[in-house]
A protein has these predicted regions:
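A charged N-terminal "starter" segment
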Residues: 1-130, 172-178, 205, 209-212, ...
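Charged (often Lys/Glu-rich) extended helix/loop segments that serve as interaction or gating elements
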Residues: 2, 8, 244-246, 253-405
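General structural feature for long, well-ordered alpha-helical segments within catalytic domains
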Residues: 3, 19-22, 26, 30, ...
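Conserved, mostly hydrophobic/aromatic
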Residues: 23, 46, 68, 100, ...
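Active-site beta-loop-alpha junctions enriched in small/polar residues
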Residues: 44-50, 67-70, 90-92, 111-113, ...
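Short acidic, glycine/serine/threonine-rich loops at helix termini
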Residues: 54, 77, 97-102, 119-122, ...
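Structured core elements
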Residues: 63, 86, 107-109, 133-135, ...
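Active-site loop/helix belt of alpha/beta enzymes
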Residues: 139-277, 341, 367, 378
């Protein structure tokens, strides 16, 4: 059992705490699922891009799915090899494209004809041939939250089958483009295997047609990730996920790329916060804690529910429903409504669970609140992997503007 009391003697709340052994196990389970087939697991940095987490994964020979040049440089800084990095995203700037090509990453996932022509022009100016993949929108409902559904025709992502074919043929004729992969991504937090299999089958059929047309594909890039059980939902078994993709690719000698993020890091993380006050307003019980929606946005943005565990011994205290809320000046600054928790006192510590994904990576300084300390638990030892911001950090980049005022 982990000794939180020792932790509280040296570190003030709120802070993120990650169990690195859980991250290792989650990543290695993906490698095991695709064992025996050419594959590359490209961790999706958007889930959590802390350098120490990336370094841990780099040592396990992870690739990286990046959606900005900043993420690419983070991956490289952490030791992930350029030939294991794919660059996705619907709005890559010319600067980002040029940098990615100079770094000689594995390939760029292209999302429009205009982007394709931009890449070609930049590749021509550099005197190189750009490896590209085209993101196909299979128009399949991922059955997930609408904010993170990406595979329907009304979504901004990817291109339809007809346009994809035109883009591949156009790229094939170019002296500065090398089409090497097909890609699709139907959404995040996937709890139903059927849409993934359907999309894999549909895009695999397209891949076979492209190969028949003389396009030398080498990769089959499956975006999106297996969901996590936040509310005791039934999740997809990793073996079934892998077998579904492998079965769809029968007859295709392509390296499989998958891009998990949430399922690698979510369950490793806790947000540790302490009670500031208890209050009752019109018979409603509120527990006010020192973490806020700026630190962890998912409950406010997605109405996501994360279990809350009381760390401080509370045996014998009366249990009743309450809303656990933060100090930010918005009613949406609520971590969990109607949580059945014991009576709590100022200084009591609680843990918000499964926050390793889309927690710190979506944090902000809203209300001029410094970003949090982040800690790693590895081999029974605690170490700091991100320092807590100081108050001075809130305005450090603005001070130059005061000169001459």
């Amino acid at each position: 059992m982990f000794n939180y009391e020792e932790l509280f003697q040296t570190h003030k709340t709120p802070f993120y705490l990650y169990d690195f052994d859980k991250i290792k196990r989650a990543f290695l389970s993906y490698k095991e699922a695709f064992k025996g087939r050419k594959s590359l697991i490209c961790y999706a940095l958007k889930a959590n891009s802390n350098l120490s987490i990336l370094s841990l994964l780099a040592h396990l020979e992870s690739g990286a799915d990046c959606v900005s040049i900043g993420e690419i440089y983070r991956a490289l800084k952490a030791g992930i090899k350029p030939y294991r990095i794919v660059f996705s995203g619907v709005g890559k700037s010319a600067f980002e494209i040029e940098q990615a090509l100079k770094l000689n990453i594995l390939f760029l996932n292209v999302e429009s004809f205009m982007e394709l022509t931009t890449i070609e022009k930049i590749a021509q100016s550099l005197g190189i041939k750009a490896r590209i993949s085209i993101r196909i929108n299979p128009n399949i409902d991922a059955k997930t939250h609408p904010y993170i559904s990406t595979g329907l025709k009304e979504n901004k992502f990817g291109v339809g089958e007809k346009e994809a074919l035109e883009m591949f043929l156009w790229a094939k004729k170019s002296a500065f483009l090398e089409p090497v992969s097909v890609h699709f991504h139907i959404g995040s937090q996937l709890l139903d295997l059927e849409p993934i299999i359907e999309a894999s089958q549909k895009v695999a059929k397209i891949a076979k047609s492209l190969i028949a047309l003389g396009i030398d594909l080498r990769f089959f890039d499956v975006g999106g990730g297996i969901g996590v059980s936040y509310e005791n939902e039934e999740t997809i078994k990793l073996y079934d996920y892998a077998q579904g993709i492998l079965n769809a690719l029968q007859g295709l000698d392509l390296t499989i790329i998958c891009e998990p993020g949430r399922s690698i890091v979510a369950e490793s993380g806790e947000l540790i916060t302490q009670v500031l006050y208890e209050k009752k307003a019109q018979n409603k019980r509120f527990v006010v804690v020192d973490a806020g929606m700026n630190d962890f946005l998912r409950p406010s943005l997605y109405h996501a529910k994360h279990a809350i565990r009381v760390i401080t011994p509370s045996k014998g205290r009366e249990i009743s429903p309450c809303d656990v809320v933060g100090p930010v000046c918005e009613s949406s600054d609520t971590f969990l409504k109607d949580a059945n928790l014991p009576e709590l006192e100022p200084g009591d510590k609680i843990a918000i669970e499964k926050v390793g994904a889309y927690g710190s990576s979506m944090a902000s300084q809203y209300n001029s609140r410094p970003k949090l300390l982040e800690l790693a638990l590895e081999d029974h030892k605690i170490r700091v992997i991100r320092k807590r911001e100081a108050l001075e950090d809130l305005w450090r980049l603005e001070e130059e503007g005061l000169k001459g005022v």
